[in-house]
Amino acid sequence: MLHIALLAAVLASQPMTAEAARSQIVSEEVTFVAGGRTIPGTLVHPELGTGPGLLLLAGSGPTDRDWNSPLLPGKNGSARLLAEALAARGVTVLRFDKAFSGKNPGLPIADLTLDTYRDEASAALDFLRSRAEVDPARVFVAGHSEGGIHATRLAESRGDRIRGVILISAPGRSLREILEVQLEKNILGSAKMTPEQVEAEMVPVRTALRSFVAGQDVDPKSASSNPQIVAILSALMSPMVARIGRELASFEPAQAAAGIAAPVLVMQGGKDVQVDPVEDAGRLVTARRSARKAVDYHLSPLADHVLKTEPRSLEEVRANLQLLTTAYNAPDRTLADDLVEALAKWIRDH
């Protein structure tokens, strides 16, 4: 047993090729039950021994367990790469298809709420803790992008079962605030309008978003004549998804993160154009420090939103956002090494 532990420690400290890493891990297709529904997932673990476990929660929309999406080309999902890299470093990782993604059909969409995602994650947590490969006292949860919200809410309800929380490329602002900023900068700002014209266009948009969060029914067409803005607001406010749309738009991530009892690691990519290192990651870290709660921060200089290495400058990336997002899961792209190592070390140290 001592020899196995020593060998594992030596291997964990050495860089390895992707092929060598995969040869030392086991990947299993698994299922568990949440709310009477069978949830499919993948468990990746080292061949030998018992160690820490990590529950990995995906981001928004139809993003599946591997962080692939039918809305984006490619199948080189970052979650699969991350799970395999961490398993090669001694961490058992569970990822699963959340409601309405991958092989999980979900429930009637009008019934979808934040609690749906929390309950799925809670059942996944119990499943992970029950596995022989996992030390139940050392189980962590990591949420990517919107998944950071679900990780935070899981920690609120199941904090006694979670050793630590990792917020990866996660928002620190409410969806309402993020939408207001993005609509102003990305859509109206690219239309060659004067600052005064932009502000005049944004007043009814802000009013519509805030009225929606307050519980009022809002017609997106009353907020703007810009078809892109109407389409984005409709995706949030349509009667079919208004319930969860309102919950997401009103949720304050930094405020909620301040209440997590467990230690928190905030991870952010320097080439991320969807989540801001200051306005999002910075708010999460500041909220934790203001509440005198344990927090660590890792900024990966070359990582984009999906943790892949992005060699272009931030200015080049911002100049062609469509090229960036369509290349997220391109087959030749790899994870930022420093981010993987920092995450593995943080788990080992806790």
Label each region the model flagged:
Residues 78, 111-131:
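Alpha/beta-hydrolase active-site loop
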Residues 273-279:
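Conserved alpha/beta-hydrolase "acid-adjacent" motif
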Residues 306-307, 312-350:
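Catalytic active-site module of serine/aspartate enzymes centered on a nucleophile-bearing elbow/loop
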Residues 260, 266-268:
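Short beta-strand/loop motif that positions the catalytic acidic residue
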Residues 123, 127-133, 137-189, 193-194:
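Primarily recognizes the serine-hydrolase "nucleophile elbow" in alpha/beta-hydrolase
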Residues 17-53:
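N-terminal cap/lid segment of alpha/beta-hydrolase-fold proteins
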Residues 166-259:
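Accessory cap/linker subdomain of secreted extracellular hydrolases
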Residues 48-50, 54-85:
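Short, surface-exposed "cap/lid" segments of acyl-processing enzymes
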